[in-house]
């Protein structure tokens, strides 16, 4: 149980401190589940606003102004454009506008900086006051409004607005490339940093913007306006440590729109305080407005650690829409009603996770002596709709309250596109907590599930007056509960209460891991003993029963079901003697009706019924009829999901093989040019290798694209005995056909080549020894569930080739050479584990072996016209004498399911061809171009080499 001490006096005592720009400590319950995200935001804050800690010294301690002449004339416009820098520091004015007062104000195209710091107005606008509009745009240097202040004028009376800037027209901050600072500004009444009676627009800025530690005791700790739009900004915007009455950061009388921002928008540690909790003030810890929309933001929106003395720890509003945005998080916020959100009377709230997740965690209300977790509080006639697109979640780790009367049903996933998850979970509430309101959400009105999944997990529960499942899936997990309750208009009776469930799923992994089945409960109405059965409500459970995991997928690939399981408790029913839970059309035997991948087997469900007498001392024992659904599991094998099969894991061996084979074949230049035979030559070669492997039943094909270079140093004796040392390096990408799976590789090959002529060059033999090392990065995509995983392995390849050719001269310019060559290659790769979604482990069980015997004829034609040139044509038949395909064992780590994959069944006969051109540009320099390829019914290869030879 959360034991938060009474806070009213504590925060009332801090109200005075807030007025002077100090921020009260905000109580935090437990470690934020979004800890990593919070750390990233801390780093983002530090890097985005590097000048924050040095603003006081940076702006100086002596009065400075860039301008001479009349700076205070409410009928004239002031335009400050194309200045290198602007300074207005420590200026005092006895009425509006400590530094400047005018009709319309424009600040644009400042190159270096603009400082408005430590200015004081005895009236509105501590730094700038405008009768008309104020625009700050297209500035390249930092813009700093620091420690400006607007004080009430005792002689004229009236309220003051805008600690830094106040205007009666519209206020615009747009297209700035310099970081914007509103820091430590304060005012006696409205808008701690800025206030406008018109529309405030913060739009299209390309630099961060900060509202920090601004205060306004009457409202709008950072800004106050009629309407505010924050849109199209690409860098972070922070509202941090601001303090006001209504709206710790922002207060508007009509709307706030946050839209199309690719940079994050953060509301952190803002506070709404009031001198009295009963005054109706002190609401909206971050935002207080009539209409708030958060739409189409790719960037993250965060409300964290905001506090109010009354309504809505983060937001107090009548109309709220969140849709088509990236992640939106509400964490660690606190209020008296509505830990995160307060929905005022006749409200409409649409929370749709359509391009990112929406999450509520660790939000709290402290209405009673002991604080409790709460996300949303709905007042009378609220219209609340919660939705999520497929692949996204609207998650509540804190309960919601939907208890005041309304004619609008609470709707889960209202639209056809809402096929995602609405999650209620108490996973982050301490195990020791036993305060029911920390776990249970309540609707004393009508509720409907229309699409997608409503998931209740980890001790969370719902109390419904009326719940109807019109579509979608209701999923229950560990210790979850659904109970009946009274009507909001007649809280003393539950007449008419009914829960209708027609498509129930159980989160099997959570049941097996934590051991407590979910419950459907006809709940007694009494709040204290003695408790009695409630004979008014009914629960109707019908349709199939399915098993799912946390991702709303079947669980057979996410847990180990390789062994038999007995007496798995799937569901509990707590009923009354009159049997008001109807299961006549409920079919748990449907567990065996669906086909699936993963572990195969048979479920044997059965009911156990227990009848007792009422024990009225406890609400859990008041009912008399208990039924429990159990099931036994008999495993029958394992069926691999094709998306997890992992054929991609064999491609590093094939890629290593094709690289090595092509290099060994390129050495087959027996009887090279008679143009010149140097003692020493060095070759530099650019390589391109392309391979297409056709798909076969059960295994997809692949394409290899490889580029690299090779270096060779050769020495030849007068007897034409030749030895070469070679080094090659390749950068390769292999893509699986029919998917986005791919392998990126870096291969190196070292080789030794020896060529020996025999019997006065009647024939010649050649030998090649080579070793290759490969570094392979595998990237797998599983499109059905938008998953991806990656891993790295290493390959070792050994190769040897022996060749023999029989050169003979047909004519003086034409040479023909029949040849035969034996190429043996062995390749092996290391074991590895993936990281990412549903990772797998791969273990090499059999290496790759290949023995190929190319044989054919090579013809050379030489010409010395203009420059010595040689053409070589070659045709060969390439039978595979022996091959052992690689075999790799695969284990899906989540379930322990395992299987083997084999490499492609390479066709054993191929036709090879080669074209080679060599031109002697100079006595010591040759250029050559070499193309060789092969084709078979399964595979085609293309190897292109271009290089030069230096002769010594």
Curated annotation (Swiss-Prot):
Membrane topology annotation: Peripheral membrane protein
Key words, A-Z: Cell outer membrane, Cell wall, Membrane, Secreted, Signal, Transmembrane, Transmembrane beta strand
Subcellular location: Secreted, Cell wall; Cell outer membrane
Domain of life the protein comes from: Bacteria
Signal sequence bounds: 1-27
PROSITE patterns: AUTOTRANSPORTER
Boundaries of every Autotransporter domain copy: 646-952
Stored InterPro entries: Autotransporte_beta (IPR005546), Autotransporte_beta_dom_sf (IPR036709), Polymorphic_membr_middle (IPR011427), POMP_repeat (IPR003368)
GO cellular component terms given for this protein: cell outer membrane; extracellular region
Main localization (coarse): secreted
Record family assignment: Belongs to the PMP outer membrane protein family.
Protein name, as recorded: Probable outer membrane protein pmp16
Species in which this protein is naturally found: Chlamydia pneumoniae
């Amino acid at each position: 149980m959360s034991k938060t001490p009474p806070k009213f006096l504590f925060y009332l005592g801090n109200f005075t401190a807030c007025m002077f720009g100090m921020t009260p400590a905000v109580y935090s319950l437990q470690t934020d589940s979004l800890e990593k995200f919070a750390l990233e935001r801390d780093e983002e804050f530090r890097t985005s606003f590097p000048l924050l800690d040095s603003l006081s010294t940076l702006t100086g301690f002596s009065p400075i102004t860039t301008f001479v002449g009349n700076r205070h004339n409410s009928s004239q416009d002031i335009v400050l454009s194309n200045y290198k820098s602007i300074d207005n520091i420590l200026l005092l004015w006895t009425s509006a506008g400590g530094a400047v007062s005018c009709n319309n104000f424009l600040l644009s195209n400042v190159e270096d900086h603009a400082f408005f710091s430590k200015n004081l107005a005895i009236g509105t606008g501590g730094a700038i006051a405008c009768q008309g509009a104020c625009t700050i745009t297209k500035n390249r240097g930092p813009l700093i409004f620091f420690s400006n202040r607007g004080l009430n004028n005792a002689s004229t009376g009236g309220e003051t607005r805008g600690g830094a800037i106040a205007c009666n027209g519209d206020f615009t901050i747009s297209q700035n490339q310099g970081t914007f600072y509103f820091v430590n500004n304060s005012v006696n009444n409205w808008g701690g940093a800025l206030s406008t009676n018109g529309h405030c627009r913060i739009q299209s800025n390309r630099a961060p913007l900060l509202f920090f530690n601004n205060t306004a005791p009457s409202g709008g700790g950072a800004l106050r306006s009629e309407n505010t739009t924050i849109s199209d900004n690409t860098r972070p915007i922070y509202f941090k440590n601001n303090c006001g009455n209504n709206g710790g950061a922002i207060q508007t009388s009509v709307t706030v729109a946050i839209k199309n921002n690719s940079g994050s928008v953060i509301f952190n540690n803002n506070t709404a305080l009031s001198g009295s909790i009963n005054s109706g003030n002190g609401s909206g810890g971050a935002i207080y407005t009539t209409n708030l929309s958060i739409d189409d933001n790719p960037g993250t929106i965060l409300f964290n650690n905001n506090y109010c003395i009354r309504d809505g720890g983060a937001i107090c509003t009548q109309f709220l829409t969140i849709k088509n945005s990236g992640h939106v998080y509400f964490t660690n916020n606190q209020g008296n009603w509505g830990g995160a959100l307060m929905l005022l009377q006749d409200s409409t709230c649409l929370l749709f996770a359509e391009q990112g997740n929406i999450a509520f965690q660790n939000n709290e209300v402290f209405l009673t002596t002991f604080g409790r977790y709460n996300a949303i509080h709905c007042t009378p006639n609220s219209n609340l709709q919660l939705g999520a697109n497929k692949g996204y979640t609207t998650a509540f780790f804190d309960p919601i309250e939907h208890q005041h009367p309304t004619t609008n049903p609470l709707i889960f996933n209202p639209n056809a596109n809402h096929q995602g998850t609405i999650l209620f979970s108490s996973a982050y509430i301490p195990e020791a907590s036993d305060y029911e309101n920390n776990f249970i959400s309540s609707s004393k009105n009508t509720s409907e599930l229309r699409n997608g999944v409503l998931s209740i997990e980890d001790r969370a529960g719902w109390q419904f007056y009326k719940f109807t499942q019109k579509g979608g899936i209701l999923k229950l997990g560990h210790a979850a509960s659904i109970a009946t309750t009274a009507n909001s208009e007649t809280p003393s009776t539950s007449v008419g209460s009914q829960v209708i469930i027609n498509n129930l799923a159980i989160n099997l992994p959570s049941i097996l891991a934590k051991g407590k089945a979910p419950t459907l409960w006809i709940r007694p109405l009494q709040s204290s003993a003695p408790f009695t059965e409630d004979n008014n409500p009914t629960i109707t459970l019908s349709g199939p029963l399915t098993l799912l995991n946390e991702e709303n997928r079947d669980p057979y690939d996410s847990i180990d079901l390789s062994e038999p399981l007995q007496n798995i408790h799937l569901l509990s029913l707590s009923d009354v003697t009159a049997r008001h839970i109807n299961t006549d059309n409920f079919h748990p035997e449907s567990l065996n009706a669906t086909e699936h991948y993963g572990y195969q087997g048979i479920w044997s469900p059965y009911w156990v019924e227990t009848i007792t007498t009422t024990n009225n001392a406890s609400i859990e024992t008041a009912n008399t009829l208990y039924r429990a659904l159990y099931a036994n599991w008999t495993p029958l094998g394992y069926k691999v999901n094709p998306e997890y099969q992992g054929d991609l894991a064999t491609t590093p061996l094939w890629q290593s093989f094709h690289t090595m084979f092509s290099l060994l074949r390129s050495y087959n230049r027996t009887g090279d040019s008679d143009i010149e035979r140097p003692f020493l030559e060095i070759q530099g070669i650019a390589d391109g290798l392309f391979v297409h492997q056709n798909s076969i039943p059960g295994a997809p094909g692949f394409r290899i694209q490889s580029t690299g270079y090779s270096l060779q140093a050769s020495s030849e004796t007068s007897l034409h005995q030749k030895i070469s040392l070679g080094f090659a390096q390749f950068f390769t990408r292999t893509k699986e056909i029919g998917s986005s799976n791919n392998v990126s590789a870096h291969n190196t090959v070292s080789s030794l080549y020896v060529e020996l002529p025999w019997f006065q060059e009647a024939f010649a033999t050649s030998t090649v020894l080579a070793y290759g090392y490969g570094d392979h990065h595998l990237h797998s995509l599983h499109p059905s569930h938008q998953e991806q995983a990656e891993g790295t392995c290493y390959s070792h390849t050994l190769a040897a080739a022996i060749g023999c050719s029989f050169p003979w001269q047909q004519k003086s310019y034409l040479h023909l050479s029949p040849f035969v060559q034996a190429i043996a290659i062995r390749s092996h790769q290391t074991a590895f584990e993936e990281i990412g979604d549903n990772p797998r482990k791969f273990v090499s069980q059999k290496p790759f072996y290949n023995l190929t015997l190319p044989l054919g004829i090579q013809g050379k034609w030489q010409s010395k016209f203009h420059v010595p040139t040689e053409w070589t044509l070659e045709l060969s038949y390439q039978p595979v004498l022996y091959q052992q395909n690689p075999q790799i064992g695969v284990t899906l780590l989540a379930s322990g399911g395992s299987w083997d994959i084999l490499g492609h069944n390479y066709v054993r006969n191929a036709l090879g061809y080669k074209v080679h051109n060599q031109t002697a540009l100079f006595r010591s320099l040759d250029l050559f171009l070499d193309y060789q390829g092969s084709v078979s019914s399964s595979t085609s290869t293309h190897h292109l080499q271009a290089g030069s030879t230096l002769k010594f």
